């Protein structure tokens, strides 16, 4: 992993391929991290300058005392600049879709495209704040050994996966050792007070780069 400091926090990222090729950066979902997409890097490295990253408060990146949607945007653009990515295509999955859309609202003139994966842009009247009903986060759960924590790892929402080896790999890289045991890599307080905003449809209509939407064929979150 490489790291770049953004507003006092070290942000983790990984990159593959020739920086002279089209740049693509992939943004993960809630409580995820760069390793969710690491296995794709080698597949795309011959044609693209491919980058994955972990938002602050997740993966190998530092935690912060408070987070806003602009916090994550700054994380992304800090990585883009540090990796020397020119006119990148940004691919955002779920929560990463929200972050990528807000990133595009500020930087679409410097982007080659935006791909939103399993993310819906709602009209203002249909907007729902994801974290409005969230109770303040409790301290991270600590367990004695890594294996017990990995056994608790689940996909959300629950679903079958034909590539269990990928789930096992992700679970293994979703833990961190503390002074008293093992815990997940994400900051439980990352979403306390986080406002995603009701301006997504307005942002979408004003973007200056091509936009694509992708939904998993077997997703349980969305209907065709």
Regions found by a protein language model. Give the residues of each.
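Serine-hydrolase catalytic-loop signature spanning alpha/beta hydrolases and amidase-signature enzymes
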Residues: 29-39, 50
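Gly/Ala-rich beta-loop-alpha elbow adjacent to hydrolase catalytic centers
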Residues: 92, 96, 100
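Alpha/beta-hydrolase active-site loop signature
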Residues: 31, 55-59, 121
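The conserved beta1-alpha1 loop
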Residues: 25-29, 215
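Active-site glycine-rich loops that stabilize anionic/oxyanionic intermediates
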Residues: 20, 29-32, 94
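Flexible "cap/lid" loop of the alpha/beta hydrolase fold
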Residues: 101-105, 112-146
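Conserved serine/cysteine hydrolase catalytic core
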Residues: 175-224
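Active-site loop/oxyanion-hole signature of alpha/beta-hydrolase fold enzymes
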Residues: 4-14, 39, 51-91
